[in-house]
C-alpha cells in the first residue's frame, strides 16, 4: 500500500483511535469503562490509560508496521506541538463526560514541516 501511494506522489497522515485497546487496559487495571450516549466517560485515571495506549503502544506499533512495509513515518499525538486544540464537550442537557471534548482547531504545520 505504501509503495502504491508513494508512486502516485501521495503523502499520508494516519489518524487512529484505540477504543478496544483502551478498554482492555482499563480492565487489566481493574477499572470499568463507562459509556454515556456512546462516548467513553473519561476521568483523570481513564485519560492516563488513553494516553498510554494511543501515544505509546498503538502509535509505536503503527509506525513499526509502516516501516516494515517499506514506508517511513513518525508517531505524534494530537497534543504534541498543539496539533489539535479542543474544548470540553458541552452537552446542552448538562451531561458530564469528563475530559471528552471537541476539536475546534487543527494546526497542521507540525506535520507539514
What are these model-derived regions, one by one?
Residues 1-113:
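Nucleotide/pyrophosphate-binding catalytic subdomain
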Amino acid at each position: 500500500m505504501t509503495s502504491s501511494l508513494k508512486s502516485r506522489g501521495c503523502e499520508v497522515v494516519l489518524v487512529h483511535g484505540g477504543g478496544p485497546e483502551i478498554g482492555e487496559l482499563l480492565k487489566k487495571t481493574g477499572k470499568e469503562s463507562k459509556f454515556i450516549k456512546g462516548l467513553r466517560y473519561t476521568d483523570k485515571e481513564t485519560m492516563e490509560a488513553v494516553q498510554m495506549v494511543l501515544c505509546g503502544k498503538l502509535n509505536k506499533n503503527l509506525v513499526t508496521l509502516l516501516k516494515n512495509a517499506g514506508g517511513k513515518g513518525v508517531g505524534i499525538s494530537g497534543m504534541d506541538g498543539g496539533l489539535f486544540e479542543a474544548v470540553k464537550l458541552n452537552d446542552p442537557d448538562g451531561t458530564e463526560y469528563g475530559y471528552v471534548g471537541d476539536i475546534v482547531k487543527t494546526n497542521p504545520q507540525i506535520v507539514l514541516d
